[in-house]
Structures are given as structure tokens and as C-alpha cells.
Amino acid sequence: RRNSKELKMDYSFLIYIGMVCALCFSAVGSGFGAVKASLASVGGWQKCYINGKQDPFIMVGFAGAPLTQTIYGFLLSNFISAKLATPTLSYGIMSLCIGILAGAVIGISALFQGKVAASSADALAETGKGTAKYFIVIGIIETVALFTLVFSLLILNN
């Protein structure tokens, strides 16, 4: 007969995988979103130069908008790490699921935010108008990532 202490397993590896997924999926989405927005910003500046128009520097903001989701993934990863204090199976599975799913949602939000930022850069280059409205729409997509982060933190704290 084995001692009950011998049967106790350490499930911290599940928590670590959840931490990595939260950060990596968020960062991948941010990277793809930033590339999409950056390419459109560069194309927008090119249109301005060709047409002899002023090049709006604010398009740098469009290009960088998806990068904030990497920060959210990092924050989520840090909050998941709190479960390392008690690496039970239930905390391991919860951390893994939250890391994968919330990380993916945050990353997808960044990807689509990059697409909207790309359209915004193109529209601003064409018209020179609507900057505030473009940032409002970009911010709406940002809200999905923020809600995901906050709701994930609430679940982790239960």
C-alpha cells in the first residue's frame, strides 16, 4: 500500500503551459495585426506623397494599435502564475483552458483590430478626415480584449 503523499502529483506544468499560451497567442495576434495595419499605413503615406498631400503622422497610431493585446496576454500570464502556489489538477486544467482560450481571443481581437486599423489608415490617407471616428472603432475592438482579460481574471480569482 502506498502512502497518500506519494500519490500527490504536481500539475504545475499545466499552469505553465496556460501561461505560455496566454502570452504567445496574444503576441501572435498582435504581430499579425500590427503587420496588416503597418502595411496599410505605409501604403497610405505613399498615396499622400504621390498626390502631394500632407502625410498624417497619426497613422503610426493605427499601425501600433494591435500591440496592446500583447500586454494583456502578459498580464493574463502573470495572473495565471498565481495558481502555481497550489498546483492542483483543477487549477492546472483551469489555467490551461484560460490560457489557451483567452489568449486566442485576445490574439484574434488584435488581428481584427489590425484589419480595422488598416482600413482606417487607407481612409485617412484618401480623405484626410475622420481620425477620431477611426480610433473609436479601433477602441471598440480593443474592448473585446479588455473584457476577455477582466473576465478571465474574475474566473481565476474564484
Predicted segment positions?
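Hydrophobic, small-residue-rich transmembrane alpha-helices and their short perimembrane loops
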Residues: 8-158
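Short, Lys/Arg-enriched N-terminal segments with co-localized hydrophobic residues
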Residues: 1-8
